[in-house]
Structures are given as structure tokens and as C-alpha cells.
Amino acid sequence: MNKEILQEQKKISNKNGFEWVATLDSMKVGINKNVKDGIFPINGLRHPVVGDTSGWYIWAGEDMPKDDSFFVPLHVEHLSEWCPQVLKYLGLPPGSRFQIADNYEDIWEDKSLLDV
């Protein structure tokens, strides 16, 4: 990830009272292909980091479907091709959520995400 994105991640984490937790380019996220369709809002939630999995799950639309095949694994280094607007949120720690749309941003803590 480039230096500007890392600085933006730290700024967002700090502004919202969170510790910055790195998400390496070599790590994986769970993502739905619908993020490439221009659907809003875009949502992200972060479970604890396990191995090479960042804990991030990202999807577009209001609700997260319960379908087991909803998320596909993707290395963070490819997110710039899929959904570059989420990169600046990937420094939020496990137990965080975000939702973004045109001129809208919401970031909050959800400790239930830590109980996985």
C-alpha cells in the first residue's frame, strides 16, 4: 500500500479514536463481487486477524446475505482494482465497521465481531 493511503488510514483511525492496525498487501479479505457493480452503500467489517486473513469482509448493498458463497477471497494488493475507495479504511482495528456512499461515511465499533 502506498504511503498516502497508509497516512489516510492512520488519520481515519486516530480521528475515530481507534488504534491503527495494519492490513498488509499480502493478506486476504473476504469480498463480494457486487462491489464492482457500483452498488451503494459499501460496507466493511473486521473480525480478528488470523494467519494471512486480515479479518476484513467487504460488500455492497444494505444487507449482508447469509449465503456461504457470498464472499470470495482476494489479496489486499488487488483491492485497488476492485474497490479502491475502501483502502483508506483498512487500518481500522478488529471490531470495527464502516459504511460509505456518495458524501456519506459512518465508522463505528462493534465488539461482537471479536467473538468469532
Where are these regions (language model features)?
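Short, compact, well-ordered microdomains
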Residues: H75-V116
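Extended, charge-biased low-complexity segments
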Residues: M1-N14
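Short helix/strand-capping turn motifs
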Residues: N14-K66, L74-E77
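Alpha-helical protein-protein interaction elements
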Residues: K10-I12, P48-G51, E81, I100
